[in-house]
Amino acid sequence: MSAATTAMAGALVALYVWMGAVHGQTGDARLDGSPTAEFHFARLVYADAAGSRRGRWGGRRGAWTTDYADAEFHLMQGITRLTRVDTALVDFDGNGGRLITLRDDRVFDYPWLYAVEVGQWYLNDIEAARLREYLDRGGFLMVDDFWGEYEWSIFTDSMQRVFPDRSIVELGEDHELLHVLYDLDQRTQIPGRGGQRAGTVPHWRGIFDEDGRLMVAINFNMDMGDAWEHADDPWYPEPMTALAYRFAVNYLIYSMTH
């Protein structure tokens, strides 16, 4: 076994031991609660690829923690204002949201799943099979905040284990996702607060099932999570937050109607 494989296996074991400990000690609804509303912000918890050092929450490191839970707080406030969807509001500690691992059967209770910093993620074969099952059964995955060809390669390495038989394609400006409520055919890169990193050209990509349903919405070379997180930050451009809210609403409505 290579050193990188050993490190990833160790990180995965540590992640699930920690998740299990939190379940047992606190009964934390973020980790083990059932749905209490039509829509919860469900964030995917995953192990990092070897060498990742991004993100921190609750004493645990992990790229999945990026923007947590400010992004949830602001986005769910926006969805409540902009739609009539029965939405579970989230506070700054993440209460009201859900933290979901792919080994948790509760993943099937949430039709919309958000994965951030997927240029840092690692899915083993069991998790890849579970994600495929989730998506084939009607789930919708939105991935966000990864940049450049190196991070793209890490993302696709795991995604190819999920769908070795399906291609990733560019979304055309006429795709229903971009028009289901707001018309978003004039697409603009949504930057992180610190500006773009390795990537300069934004891409809206996706993976479809055999019936043409979009299962995975891929935001590449952009950072919608930062736009939500910094909605009240005077240093972050308000038009970008407004645009990121509109994209999120379109993704939500598409996922709940397809």
Language-model regions, residue ranges each:
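Bacterial N-terminal signal peptides
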Residues: 5-21
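Aromatic-Pro/Gly-enriched surface loop or interdomain linker
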Residues: 22-112, 118-119, 223-224, 230-258
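Short alpha-beta junction capping motif
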Residues: 41, 107-152
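Sec/Tat-exported extracytoplasmic proteins
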Residues: 45, 79-86, 117, 139, ...
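An acidic, glycine-rich "communication" segment
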Residues: 49-56, 150-230, 240, 245, ...
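Extracytoplasmic/secreted envelope proteins and their assembly/folding machinery
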Residues: 72-76, 128, 132, 152-156, ...
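Surface-exposed patches in mature extracellular/periplasmic domains of secreted proteins
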Residues: 85-98, 143-146, 166-174
